[in-house]
A protein has these predicted regions:
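Secretory pathway targeting signatures of secreted, lumenal, and periplasmic proteins
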Residues: 1-21
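Sequence-level motif detector for i,i+2 pairs with an aromatic at +2
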Residues: 2, 13, 48-53, 78
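Short, well-structured beta-strand
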Residues: 53-110
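Serine/threonine-rich, low-complexity intrinsically disordered segments
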Residues: 11-13, 46, 56, 109
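Short linear sequence elements within intrinsically disordered, low-complexity coil regions
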Residues: 12-18, 31-35, 79, 92, ...
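Stable alpha-helical elements in mature extracytoplasmic
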Residues: 14, 18-26, 96-103
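Signature of long, low-cysteine stretches enriched in small and polar/charged residues
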Residues: 25-74
Length: 110
């Protein structure tokens, strides 16, 4: 399936606050007759520079399509940089470490 990645910066957020916020957002947003969150898992991986990156994996169904969303959250002092990766498909085994290397280590985070 297609993979779509986008980056954002959130100021004055901690990684844990942002992940909690995202969990709530997904739970509320994908909660009607057409869509639902099936499963959410989170944890941490290490970026190349040793920074602890928090990840959130969301398995959801929307209009009979299974989708997998992965959020990587990289803290930079007072802010966090996020990379949101969307698969228009169900991904059974998400390798967060590999995604971190592909998407986070590839960009220059100041």
């Amino acid at each position: 399936g297609d993979v779509y990645a986008s980056y954002s910066t959130y100021t004055h957020y901690s990684a844990s606050d942002l992940v909690k916020n995202m969990k709530d957002t997904y739970t509320e947003y994908y909660n009607d007759e057409n869509s639902k969150v099936n499963e959410m898992t989170d944890g941490t991986v290490k970026a190349k520079d040793g920074t602890e990156v928090t990840y959130l994996v969301i398995q959801l169904t929307s209009y009979d399509m299974d989708r997998t969303e992965v959020l990587l959250v990289y803290p930079t002092g007072e802010d966090v940089v996020t990379c949101s990766i969307s698969y228009w498909d169900k991904v059974d085994k998400v390798d967060a470490q590999k995604l971190c290397e592909t998407f986070m280590d590839a960009i220059e985070i100041k």
